[in-house]
C-alpha cells in the first residue's frame, strides 16, 4: 500500500512561499552596531520563476520590487544576551583571554532580520572540548549543575572537517570549535586542519555571506574578507577565494552555493557560475563527493523556500546529469531534452499548485508533515518525464529509473522512491478518470468491465463507481496525483515549450479544478474512509458458509461497487440485493 500523502493539507497559499518580510522590532531585542555599515540596504534584482525554466521572470522594474532588507544592526534576544553573558563570565573567571565569535549562518541571518537558533562559537586559542570543560568548572563554582559535553568527531561525509564540542547552555544547544585554516591534498576532499586566525577562518568559508563573525567580546560584526556585508547588500553569492580553486578543494561547495542562492533568492556571481560549469569541477563533483552528501544538499534545496530556482540553476550550470545520475542501461534510453523536460515539469507543478491556491492546498495538518508531502510532490513532478523509463537491476527486476535516481543517485529513503513511483502510477490512472469525467464517451464498455453475472450497475452510477474505486486505492493524495496527471497528460512531444505557456497552464488549471469539483460533487472526497456496508462476517452469513476464502473476497468487492452505486443504500438493502442476485443466478443456471 502506498504511503499516505496529504498534499491537499499544505499551508494556505499553495507550494510557493510568501515574500520575505522584515521582522518587527521587539522590546526584548538589543541592537548591536556593525563595525562598518552605512545603513539599511536593498538587494539588486534577483531571479524569480513564472515562465521559462532558467529565465528571469518579469520586467526589470518588477524584479526591483522584490528586494530584501539587510539590517544595520544585530538584534540579540534576551536569551542570546544571557547565553553570551554566561560565556564571557567563563572567560573572565579563568582569565582565558579567549575571543568568542559567533560564526557563519547565525550572523548572516541576523543581518537579514531572521531568527536563528544555530549558534556556533569559534574560539581563537583553545579547542571546543577544553572550553566546554571550563564552562562546567565555572558552573560548579557557582553551585549550578554541570552539563554533558558531546564531542562530534571529524566526519567528512557529513561535512565535519574538525572536531566540534556541543553542550546545553541555558536550554540552548551551542557548538564550540576552534578557528581553523585548511589545505586540501590533490587526491582528497579531506582537508589538513590547523589552528588559524579569524581572518584565515573567514577565508576558508564556502561563501562570503557565511564568512561573517559576531565578536561577543566587543559586540561587533567582523567582516574579515571585506566582502561579506557588501555581498549581502547586493544579494550576491560569492566565494572568499577564487571560485574554481574553492570548488576544486571541495566540490560540494558548488551545490551549497546553489542552495544558498535559492534560499535567499540571491544571484550567483558570474565567476562562480563559470567555475561551477567547468568540466574539471563537474568531474570532481561527480567523482570526489559521496552520493549521500550530494543527496543531502539536494534534499535541503527541495525542502527550502525556492526549490525551483535551485533546480533551474543546477540545469543552467550543466550539472543536471552530474547530480541526478542515471543507470547505465535504461529502456527507453535517455531522450533528447530529458533534463529540460524535468525542469519544465517541476516549474509547471510549482506554478500550477500556487495558482490553484488554498481551495486545494488548505491548512489543518502538522506543518512538518505538510513540508514532507510538498517535498515528495516536487520530486514526483521533477521525475514525471521519466515515469515510463525502466532499467534491470542486479536481479533482472524491472525498476523505474526515478526509483534508481532517488535511492542510488541521491541515496534518499527507499520509501521516498516508493512514494514517487506510486504517485506516477496514480497519475496514469487519473488520466483515464479525467477522460471519463471530462468527455461524453460511451460508458458501456466501462460498465461491462465493472459488472459481472451477479452485479448490475446503473448507467448513471458508472462514473461514481469507477472514480470511487480509484480514490480508494490512491487515498489521501488523490489531489497530488491529479496535479501530476494534468501536467503529464495529454503527452506532448514539445513539453518543454508547451508547459511554459501561461495559457496552457491556465487550461490545465481549469481541468484540475473541474475534475476536483466533479469528484467533490460526487461526494467521493474521503471515500477511502468509507466503512463497508457489509463486512466479511455478514457476507458469510448471507452466503451461509462458515469460513472465508476467495468467494467471500469477490462478494466484498461486489458489495463495495454496489455501495458506491447506491451511496444512500442500507445494510438490509444490500443484503436483499445479494439474495436476489444469487437467486437470479441460480435460476439461470437451472434453466441452462
Question: Which sequence ranges carry the predicted segments?
Answer:
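Catalytic cores of the polymerase beta-like nucleotidyltransferase superfamily
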Residues: 1-592
